[in-house]
Amino acid sequence: MDKNRRRGIERLCDEQIVPGTEVILLDDAFQHRYVKPGINILLVDYHRLICDDKLLPAGRLREPKEGKDRANIVIVTKCPEDIKPMGFRVISKALKLYPYQKLFFSTLKYSRLIPLFEEGEYPLDELLPHKHVLLLTGIASPEQMKMDLEHYETDITPLSFGDHHYFSAKDVA
């Protein structure tokens, strides 16, 4: 893409890079005011709700909490699978959303494991205890994924890169 989101979108449209494109979905574009979105979707971590967070550098917020009012949709991510209806209501009340804002909840569901040095795939629940796993991530908060894998008593070597890291061969060599 382009660090200048507006220019990147204009280039996509002008050059017809993907003919027939009707939707452009941007990650981490909530605070980019030069782009006029058709819909704003805000992702909020279940373990660190926006109402409990602080602005950088004390917290993870890039703008004041009130910025959430621009969101059309709020998705609370990384919810436990066994969350009760009361938990949904408590979070809904804490977020103080407006009637025009839709609230959704999501949970993590991992795909199948793909071994590096052999063919095939297998489900996470078939991960053998004491099997060595290289956990390569390029996401903002890999801690939950690491904790989920530790549940399987697996030997984990984390190799974590920042969110949106541009991987090179040197990174994984």
Residue spans for each PLM region:
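Beta-strand->loop->alpha-helix junctions that form or flank phosphate-binding loops
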Residues: 94-96, 101-109, 158-162
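Redox- and metal-dependent alpha/beta enzyme cores, enriched for Fe-S-associated oxidoreductases
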Residues: 118, 128-169
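Phosphate/Mg2+-binding loops and adjacent switch elements
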Residues: 1-99
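A short, well-structured juxtamembrane/interface segment
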Residues: 4-11, 120-123, 171-172
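Short hydrophobic/aromatic-enriched beta-strand-loop microsegments
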Residues: 22-24, 42-44, 103, 154-161
